[in-house]
């Protein structure tokens, strides 16, 4: 039986951005609804009233960073209007909406579907970890978490990836665009790795989440790192600058690998006995469970 599509609310300011996001949300898995934009006849979107009116229908949100000012954020948190969220905008290293949000730059939207899955996984896992309850004033969050778990199944996106969306299963052009998007994310990660660790961590999360959910081969991850360092080396050489420090960026690759290893480790449900793992040893890799994202 096919899973029901997840309803993703798009809170964006321009038709071009809406079109770009819809392009990368497969309609076989997601149903996107546009809750903002000039065509809505609104000069300024009221995030609180908009989300409150659609609260029962929304499973996750894709929201533009500039819409999340301090006042809107405080009102959303105060009313318990929390959803799995992907914030589209710059990697600034700070929280725009809530602690479980994920970030994606506008030039990296080819990763959007994978990032939405990761955001839902993170939201559900954190709900279990922090023991949310009605006493916390977050009854609506509990209700959403239960609804997502019911619709996705007990394991949901915690432990099941979609093999049809693995890198090797994508059409050639889509695969190329996804790889180019990942390269841009990795570049952002490296550029801010030593100068702005918080922003770099957001880029790292974005890269690792997509790498995991798209089943990016480890060798391809290494290739992306080597290619990017090579580009930096060529640029430094043209400018007549020293390049010895580039070897320090091996730490970034080790960081990425450590996060990926942790995700695979967490992909094994804690209540599955070792005998169960042994009996499934010969399953195809596409059927292996997966995990929520990890942040440093």
From Swiss-Prot:
Domain KaiA N-terminal: 2-152
Pfam family, one: KaiA
Alphabetical list of SMART domains matching this protein: KaiA
Keywords: Biological rhythms
InterPro entries: CheY-like_superfamily, Circadian_clock_KaiA, Circadian_clock_KaiA_N, Circadian_clock_protein_KaiA_C, KaiA/RbsU_helical_domain_sf
One BP annotation, GO: circadian rhythm
Keyword ATP-binding: no
Domain KaiA C-terminal: 162-270
Residues spanning the membrane: none
Region of interest: Flexible linker: 153-161
Keyword tRNA processing tagged: no
Matching SUPFAM superfamilies: CheY-like (SSF52172), KaiA/RbsU domain (SSF101215)
Location of region: PsR domain, binds oxidized quinones: 2-133
Function: Key component of the KaiABC oscillator complex, which constitutes the main circadian regulator in cyanobacteria. Complex composition changes during the circadian cycle to control KaiC phosphorylation. KaiA stimulates KaiC autophosphorylation, while KaiB sequesters KaiA, leading to KaiC autodephosphorylation. KaiA binding to the KaiC CII domain during the subjective day yields KaiA(2-4):KaiC(6) complexes which stimulate KaiC autophosphorylation. Binds oxidized quinones via the N-terminal PsR domain, allowing it to sense redox changes and possibly mediate clock input.
Subunit-level organization: Homodimer. The KaiABC complex composition changes during the circadian cycle to control KaiC phosphorylation. Complexes KaiC(6), KaiA(2-4):KaiC(6), KaiB(6):KaiC(6) and KaiC(6):KaiB(6):KaiA(12) are among the most important forms, many form cooperatively. KaiA and CikA bind to the same region of the KaiB(fs) form and therefore compete.
Domain notes: The N-terminal pseudoreceiver domain (PsR, approximately equal to KaiA N-terminal) binds oxidized quinones. The KaiA C-terminal domain mediates interaction with KaiC, homodimerization, and is responsible for the clock oscillation function.
Protein name in the entry: Circadian clock oscillator protein KaiA
């Amino acid at each position: 039986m096919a899973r029901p599509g997840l309803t993703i609310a798009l809170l964006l300011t321009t038709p071009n951005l809406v079109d770009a996001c819809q392009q990368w949300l497969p309609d076989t898995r997601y149903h996107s609804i546009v809750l903002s934009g000039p065509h809505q006849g609104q000069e300024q979107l009221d995030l609180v009233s908009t989300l409150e009116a659609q609260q029962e229908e929304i499973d996750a949100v894709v929201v533009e960073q500039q819409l999340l000012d301090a006042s809107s954020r405080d009102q959303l948190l105060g009313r318990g209007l929390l959803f799995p969220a992907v914030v589209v905008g710059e990697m600034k290293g700070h929280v725009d909406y809530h602690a479980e949000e994920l970030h994606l730059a506008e030039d990296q939207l080819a990763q959007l579907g994978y990032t939405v899955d990761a955001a839902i996984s993170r939201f559900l896992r954190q709900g279990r970890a922090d023991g949310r309850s009605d006493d916390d004033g977050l009854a609506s969050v509990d209700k959403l978490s239960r609804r997502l778990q019911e619709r996705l199944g007990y394991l949901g996106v915690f432990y099941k990836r979609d093999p049809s969306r693995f890198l090797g299963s994508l059409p050639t052009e889509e695969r190329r665009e996804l790889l180019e998007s990942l390269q841009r994310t990795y570049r952002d990660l490296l550029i801010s790795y030593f100068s702005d660790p918080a922003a770099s961590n957001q880029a790292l999360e974005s890269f690792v989440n997509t790498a995991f959910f798209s089943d990016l081969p480890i060798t391809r991850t290494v290739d992306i790192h080597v290619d990017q360092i090579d580009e930096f080396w060529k640029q430094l050489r043209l400018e007549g600058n020293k390049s010895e420090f580039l070897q320090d960026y091996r730490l970034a690759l080790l960081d990425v690998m450590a996060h990926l290893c942790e995700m695979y480790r967490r992909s094994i449900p804690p209540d599955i006995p070792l005998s169960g793992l042994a009996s499934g040893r010969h399953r195809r890799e596409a059927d292996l469970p997966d995990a929520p994202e990890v942040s440093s």
